[in-house]
A protein has these predicted regions:
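A short beta-strand motif that forms part of the nucleic acid-binding face
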Residues: 9, 44-46, 192
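OB-fold and OB-like beta-barrel modules that bind single-stranded nucleic acids
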Residues: 1, 20-33, 44
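Extended, highly charged clamp/arch subdomains and adjacent linkers
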Residues: 40
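Beta-strand/loop nucleic-acid-binding surfaces
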Residues: 2-18
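Extended, charge-rich, solvent-exposed interface segments
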Residues: 16, 43-106, 110
C-alpha cells in the first residue's frame, strides 16, 4: 500500500540530512484528508534516517567499483562534435523525452537528422534494450548519441544504473550524451557518458547547433 507524504518547509529546516530517492526513513506525523481530491495524506513532522536503502547501496557499490576501474576518468571522455548533423537517440518512442528532443531540434536546426532506436527504458528488460540500442546506433557512423528518458523514481530510472548499460556507453565509439530524468537525478550512466545533460531537452540543446547563428 502507498500513501502520499508531505513535509512543509518549517519542519524541513530541522532535518539533519538531505532526502534522496532510495533512502529508508522513519516518519512521524499525522494522517488527514487532502481536501482538494479527498485523498488521505501523511503530514510529516519528523523524519529520521533508518538505513540507506537497498537500491541506494547497490548504486554506491557499483559507482565505486567502476570508478576504481577508471571508467569515469576524463581521459576516456570523447568530445561532443560542435556541428553534428546526424544524431542517434536511445529512448522510448512514446514519452516526453523524444518529444522534447524533437521540439528542440526543429527549433534550433531542422536540417539535423534524428535517428531513433525505440528502447524500453523501464522494467527488467530495459537494460538489454538500451544496450542493444547503443550498439546498433554505434554502427551507423553517427555524430553523437543521446541516451536517456524522462523523469521518474529511482526504481523507474534503474536501468540506467545497470553495469551492462554503463559498459555499453563506455565502449561506444560514438560520443554519448546521457540525459536521464531531471536535473536532480544522477545515474551511473551519467558518470560514464562523455557528457551529462540534466534533462533530455538540455541534451538536445547541447547536441544540436543553432543554424540561425550563421544567418
Amino acid at each position: 500500500a502507498q500513501i502520499a507524504a508531505v513535509m512543509f518547509a518549517g519542519q524541513r529546516k530541522g532535518l539533519d540530512f538531505t532526502l534522496a530517492e532510495g533512502q529508508e526513513v522513519i516518519v512521524s506525523g499525522t494522517v488527514d484528508v487532502y481536501e482538494k481530491d479527498g485523498r488521505y495524506q501523511l503530514y510529516a513532522k519528523e523524519i529520521k534516517r533508518e538505513g540507506r536503502g537497498d537500491l541506494f547501496l547497490r548504486f554506491e557499490k557499483l559507482r565505486d567499483e567502476l570508478e576504481e576501474m577508471g571508467m569515469f576518468d576524463g581521459c576516456y571522455k570523447q568530445p561532443i562534435p560542435k556541428y553534428a548533423t546526424r544524431i542517434g537517440i536511445v529512448t522510448a518512442s512514446t514519452g516526453a523525452a523524444i518529444r522534447d528532443i524533437m521540439n528542440i531540434t526543429s527549433r534550433r536546426n531542422p536540417y539535423v537528422q534524428l535517428i531513433l532506436y525505440p528502447a524500453l527504458v523501464q522494467g527488467e528488460k530495459a537494460k538489454y534494450s538500451i544496450v542493444q540500442g547503443i550498439k546498433t546506433l554505434d554502427q551507423m557512423g553517427l555524430d553523437v548519441l543521446i541516451v536517456g528518458r524522462g523523469g521518474g523514481s529511482m526504481e523507474d530510472l534503474w536501468a540506467f544504473n545497470e553495469e551492462m548499460v554503463a559498459r555499453a556507453i563506455f565502449e561506444c565509439h560514438t560520443p554519448v550524451i546521457s540525459a536521464v530524468g531531471h536535473e536532480t537525478d544522477v545515474t551511473i550512466a551519467d558518470y560514464v557518458a562523455d557528457l551529462r545533460a540534466p534533462t533530455p531537452s538540455a541534451a538536445a540543446e547541447l547536441a544540436v547547433f543553432d543554424y540561425k547563428q550563421f544567418e
